[in-house]
């Protein structure tokens, strides 16, 4: 009988483009999502959880052009790959599932309920999304999105509300006023400016695309570089040539004037935009919407120190149909090359009035925002407000195996007082290993009670944080005056542990 071939052991590794999150990283994200969710909830938005898997047909953007979805999504076929099996895919954003839900339950009762979705429908959602794209530094195939959208509200009051809510979210997670700004623009205004500049009509679609990409590079290339891209084109430092939009110098002036129309306050900016869109109905409509948004925000106390009309915001204008907004953090950080740069964008959104049209054939107005959770966490780390460290539990050490019930009673007392605590459950034979474990867990306090201490009704409290500091740089006199280990009565255990934890916060 042939000897059965031994199967190789699986390799323990994370798939390419994915990563694991431990301890403090998970706690920090959970805390941030909770704070943002509280703001969304306060504004009257309801939470929604959808399946991680959608039909490729519902995703829309990745419909197969041959016999399977394109490579941008993680997709698989039902029924073992049979020809009539539906293609399914992991969601690539939170908007596609919202479109499906809004269409599916527009008139149909919600599961287990009698009513269908209200209109307008206000929802927020948080969770991972997946994109089958080439990974890179800081770019993963799974990441978190945190969205809020209003479906069925045509008024720009819904857009103004999203902007106000976005500002409140940033402050709720610890971004101070003055360190951020929410910038607002409108696709209709840009359409109007392009119309005035002779770029209307289907035959100018390619040129409009070049204009959009050009003005998005304003920060990097400056007005001169953008002007080149609006004209014949531009040669970069490497000698590569980028073809331009081919518009006249006079019309390029109009585009640049639009991008640079931001003035000292929102009213002055609106005035500049009115003159630039004169003669264009769509442009005039867009300026009027921006004026309404600024007025609605001012009535709620959101001035230009927090939210401004800024025509230089063009990212996403190719997708949105009306107002578009972007939250930018304005403080400086060091980039990977050691250069001082502004932190930049952490959230964006806008109005998209064709959300459920693919499903119903009818236009349904919608507006929303998506907050980049990982970017926002990185910003808080950059400002020192998050340290990437999570305080570990208090460790009750085990001096006598036969007294485990007493140690468990002790840890229960701590937990009942709201203190995170655990009993050491490894091999207690080597006490030094218990303290090493406590250090590795970043524990603030180790509790020690042998039979002698138990007989006297006391415990030893070892302040591990103070002990580490003293071991690092304390003089002999400081070490003697600040003992890292003290003896306290069992009756005072909770109060003394709370005092040590509070001292190191």
From Swiss-Prot:
Its EC number is 6.1.1.21. One of its GO terms (molecular function) is histidine-tRNA ligase activity. The lineage of its organism: Bacteria, Pseudomonadati, Pseudomonadota, Alphaproteobacteria, Rhodobacterales. The gene is hisS. Belongs to the class-II aminoacyl-tRNA synthetase family. Signal peptide: none annotated. It comes from the Bacteria. Coiled coil: none annotated. PROSITE patterns: AA_TRNA_LIGASE_II. The keyword Cytoplasm applies. Pfam families: HGTP_anticodon, tRNA-synt_His. This is Histidine--tRNA ligase. Gene3D superfamilies: Anticodon-binding domain, Bira Bifunctional Protein, Domain 2.
